[in-house]
């Protein structure tokens, strides 16, 4: 088209000279260019979803989401900007000319348009998809079901402040279909089945990486209900990966399973240690069931009551210690404790070492067979996989739980009794 060669604010050759005055405010009405990422995400060097009303990360963490105006690129102009009077003098219009005043009086007020530019979709990067095209899971659900839902007709302001868009990785080894509806254009990932074929593809490594990546992204933000629910989901994911039947069939996937699962257990334990040092009153009102929170807020010793609740929450989630039934949420009851995961992984590694099929080579290709038999009788501290599993016990010992806080069948842990990796 003929008009594509001319930028905004420039007059077309067929235009009259009187249109030059109208083009000047048109250029001023262009929306200012803002950063595609908000200030909070850019400061922490994290990926920003770029929603106008607030990115998903700031909404989850109840932070103020603001998109700063981009500075002009390139070298600054050498000459000072002309004043408004200079612009009028270029058109040979005197300041006291009544024609100029009458024309300027009819110029629309573009200040409101510039003020409302934050509501325009132009500030979003083209790489960001519509926020309503993603499924989200309600972390603020009173029942803590964390079911996937789609909200194509709801605004972002109606979503609670601790919503989370990341999937539930706990069903990594489930053979049944997903309970949620996949959005258009997305296909569910391939889940490992119970088939023990050596060629069976396994997605455990991908889910472990997603969990580690998500937990690391939560570190710069304060502890919230989203953090607690993420730890429960990561614990269920770790349990599913530990019970995977496809990873042990190959040496590389088995080694990756051991190392990444051990890393995830250490990260989960360290995150719970960080939760234990959080503000009990603020966190308790977010995490505890509403009825239990109302009862706690009526306590004469409010701070002491919430500190006791936080101690119970951490103790229940780390070592499955005693906790009030009314204070437990469904996601806390369904997720295994950190100590349960450590013990289950240790038992699995012992089974792997006792199995004659755990060697990476076939029997006819093995060398020094007597030394292989001696490997089964070595001390557990010499086995790397056992040491990786037990490294999370050192973190559990830092909580300082007393012996009466542990379940009856579990011995207490102390820094001296834990095995150093």
UniProtKB/Swiss-Prot annotation:
Main location: nucleus
Compositionally biased residues, Basic and acidic residues: 346-357
UniProt keywords, alphabetically: DNA-binding, Nucleus, Transcription, Transcription regulation
Segments of skewed composition (Polar residues): 8-29
Signal peptide: none
GO BP terms in the entry: positive regulation of transcription by RNA polymerase II
Localization, UniProt: Nucleus
Cellular component terms (Gene Ontology): nucleus
Feature: DNA-binding region: 38-65
InterPro entries the record matches: Stress_Response_Reg, Zn2-C6_fun-type_DNA-bd_sf, Zn2Cys6_DnaBD
Keyword Nucleus: yes
GO MF: DNA binding; DNA-binding transcription factor activity, RNA polymerase II-specific; zinc ion binding
Entries under Gene3D superfamilies matching the protein: Zn(2)-C6 fungal-type DNA-binding domain (4.10.240.10)
Region ranges (Disordered): 1-29, 346-371
Mutant phenotype after disruption: Abolishes growth in the presence of gliotoxin. Leads to reduced growth in the presence of the oxidative stress-inducing compounds allyl alcohol, t-butyl hydroperoxide, but not menadione.
Annotated SMART domains: GAL4
SUPFAM superfamilies found in the cross-reference section: Zn2/Cys6 DNA-binding domain
Pfam families, sorted: Zn_clus
PANTHER family according to UniProt: THIAMINE REPRESSIBLE GENES REGULATORY PROTEIN THI5, TRANSCRIPTION FACTOR RGLT
Function as written in the Swiss-Prot or TrEMBL entry: Transcription factor that is important for oxidative stress resistance and essential for gliotoxin (GT) self-protection through the regulation of a gene encoding a putative gliT homolog, even if E.nidulans does not produce gliotoxin itself.
Name listed for the protein in its UniProt record: Transcription factor rglT
Highest classification ranks of the organism: Eukaryota, Fungi, Dikarya, Ascomycota, Pezizomycotina
């Amino acid at each position: 088209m003929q008009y594509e060669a001319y930028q905004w604010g420039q007059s077309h050759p067929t235009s009259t000279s009187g249109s030059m005055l109208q083009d000047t405010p048109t250029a001023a009405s262009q929306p200012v260019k803002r950063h595609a990422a908000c200030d909070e995400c850019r400061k922490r060097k994290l990926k920003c979803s770029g929603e106008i009303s607030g990115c998903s990360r700031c909404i989850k963490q109840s932070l103020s989401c603001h998109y700063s105006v981009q500075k002009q690129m390139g070298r600054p102009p050498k000459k000072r900007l002309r004043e408004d009077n200079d612009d009028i003098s270029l058109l040979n219009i005197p300041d006291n000319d009544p024609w100029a005043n009458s024309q300027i009086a009819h110029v629309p007020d573009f200040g409101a348009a510039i003020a409302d530019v934050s509501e325009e979709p132009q500030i979003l990067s083209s790489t960001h998809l519509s926020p309503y095209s993603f499924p989200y899971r309600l972390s603020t659900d009173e029942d803590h079901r964390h079911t996937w839902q789609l909200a194509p007709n709801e605004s972002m302001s109606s979503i609670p402040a601790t919503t989370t868009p990341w999937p539930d990785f706990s069903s990594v080894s489930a053979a049944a279909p997903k309970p949620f509806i996949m959005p258009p254009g997305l296909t569910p990932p391939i889940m490992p089945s119970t088939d023990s074929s050596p060629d069976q593809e396994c997605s455990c490594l991908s889910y472990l990486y997603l969990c580690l990546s998500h937990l690391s992204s939560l570190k710069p933000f304060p502890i919230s209900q989203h953090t607690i629910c993420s730890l429960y989901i990561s614990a269920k994911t770790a349990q599913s990966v530990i019970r995977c039947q496809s990873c042990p069939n190959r040496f590389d996937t088995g080694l990756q399973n051991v190392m990444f699962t051990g890393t995830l257990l250490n990260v989960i334990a360290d995150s719970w240690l960080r939760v234990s040092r959080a503000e009990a009153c603020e966190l308790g009102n977010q995490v505890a069931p509403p009825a239990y929170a109302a009862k706690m807020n009526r306590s004469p010793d409010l701070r002491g009551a919430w500190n006791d609740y936080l101690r119970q929450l951490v103790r229940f989630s780390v070592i499955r210690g005693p906790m009030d039934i009314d204070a437990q949420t469904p996601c806390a009851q369904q997720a295994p404790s950190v100590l349960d995961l450590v013990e289950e992984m240790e038992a699995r590694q012992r089974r792997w070492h006792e199995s004659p099929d755990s060697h990476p080579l076939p029997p006819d290709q093995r060398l020094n067979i007597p030394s292989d038999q001696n490997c089964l009788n070595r001390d557990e501290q010499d086995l790397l996989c056992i040491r990786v599993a037990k490294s999370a016990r050192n973190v559990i010992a830092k909580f300082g739980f007393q012996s009466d806080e542990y379940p009856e069948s579990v011995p207490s842990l102390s820094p001296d009794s834990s095995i150093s990796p």
